[in-house]
Amino acid sequence: MRGRAALAVLAVLAGCGGDAGTPAPKAASTPPAGTFDVDGHGMFIECKGDGAPTVVLESGLGVDSTSTWAAVRPAVARFTRVCLYDRAGMAASEPGPKPRTSEAMTAELHALLGKAGVKPPYVLAGASLGGMNAQLFASEHPGEVKGVVLVDSLHPDLDRRIEPLLGRRGARERRQALGQNAEGVTYTDLLASDEQVRAARADFPPVPLIALEHGISFEPGGEPVPSVEKLWGELQADNARLSPGGRVVVAAKSHHRIAEDEPDVVVGAIRKVVEQARGR
């Protein structure tokens, strides 16, 4: 993989990434919707549906949350409460303080949920960078999280392991592409996030976990990238090992943005984890 092909595929890697059978335990009957102050900046959250646990949707880097989860959220709302929010600097949320690391993002999400009155238990569904944030949130608040769905999630070892596959030029172009996003997240922020998540993963709780993986290979310009695909699969398997019984499910017809390509697969995974969480 060389030149433009390397840049194209790795810019993609920066992006995102019927009713249930068991009756839903009762949750708040008036879901919040609006902007709440989080450490001096407004953050938007909107919840739909009723029931527990509450599903919290986490989007990829610089990706609009509404479009990412457009087909997923209404389907999930039919069997439990589901909340979508805009990270600081995105859509209806105001920019937050620097640096923009996973630690900062998850702290803001936790504070936002508290301000909005969205109480645990939670099931987290995180796409791409949102999957990394979900890993950190669950590790830092294990008593509040009852399940996790990782949607083609990033992994804290991706950055250091992928660069040798690219060569000097490809690695440089990748860093530039990753630093160009609507959230103001820098490449340095992403490396710091890797360290934060890597250090926290040992505390990931033993909860139901499904790691969804894209099934359509990255082939920018028609050029296959088997080395990247092999690494990606290894990292998804490692993500699944965060929890006993965690497993990888391949979305055969999807590129990186599985929630947009195969929303039914994402909804099915969330439903399964919610059902398991209710049985715990």
Question: Where on the chain are the PLM-derived regions?
Answer:
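Bacterial signal peptide processing site
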Residues: 16-20
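N-terminal cap/lid segment of alpha/beta-hydrolase-fold proteins
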Residues: 24-42
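Conserved HGGG/HGGXW glycine-rich cap/lid loop of the alpha/beta-hydrolase fold
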Residues: 39-92
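Active-site loop/oxyanion-hole signature of alpha/beta-hydrolase fold enzymes
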Residues: 84-125
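Conserved hydrolase catalytic core segment
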Residues: 120-157
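Flexible "cap/lid" loop of the alpha/beta hydrolase fold
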Residues: 149-187, 224
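Conserved serine/cysteine hydrolase catalytic core
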Residues: 176-251
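Catalytic active-site module of serine/aspartate enzymes centered on a nucleophile-bearing elbow/loop
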Residues: 244-246, 252-280
